[in-house]
Amino acid sequence: MTDTQTLTFAEVDAAGLDDWRQLFEALRTRFLTGDFATGLDLVARIGALAEEANHHPDVDLRYPHVNVTLFSHDVFGVTARDVDLARAISTAAAELGVSADPTATAVVEVALDTWDHTEIKPFWAAVLGMVDSPESDRAVFDPSGAMPALWFQRTERHDEPRQRFHLDVRVPPEVAESRIADALAAGGTLVSDEHAPRFVVLADAQGNKACVTTGLGRE
């Protein structure tokens, strides 16, 4: 097995990584550090291990815990590199007396029903500032991991229903104009700019709405 070969869910499960869970394309866990200083210490140790392995996880430091996400960006999946580094990180945490709670991890994705994802995917990539998923042509994602992925669920063509929820995208004020322009250029339409600059309502070619919002005009 090469270190660029993606592992199946069963192979990852067989590796016995008790501190970790595989969710989608990544290994994830939460280390219960209890305070900021211990969290900083653990993050420093994770950083040293990552540099030594030349393999770098995503690390989210909070006051009572540290979230860690591991996957091989070059193949967009879990490889032996991730398994090895996960074991090393667990050892470092144990040396600090820090336990893991992998059951606290979760990943939220947003699914949009559509009869033709190719018609609306460019709009959603533009309005959300995302890119095409390397895993599927039916999804867009945020490479930074800051926002949940959006994927397009196949459905039969139907009349436009009354929309019960929509996505609001809050951006810095200086970004809003270009974000709106990109969304319109990608096949979107302007529904309303009555409340600009607080928010502008856009829609994709099938009538699904999104708002580009800023902090301006909310005093």
Q: Over which residues does each language-model region extend?
A:
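Ordered, small/hydrophobic-rich secondary-structure cores
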Residues: D3-Y63, N67
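Vicinal oxygen chelate
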Residues: F71-H73, G77-A80, P102, V107-W115, E135-T155, D159-E177, V200-A203, ...
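A common structural junction motif
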Residues: G47-H56, I89-L96, L128-V131, A185-V191
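Short, structured interface segments
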Residues: R81-D101
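Amphipathic alpha-helical segments
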Residues: D35, L40-I46, E119-M130, A183-L184
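Core segments of cupin and vicinal oxygen chelate
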Residues: T114-A149, R179
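N-terminal beta-strand motif that seeds the catalytic metal site of vicinal oxygen chelate
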Residues: A94, V98-E119, G217-E219
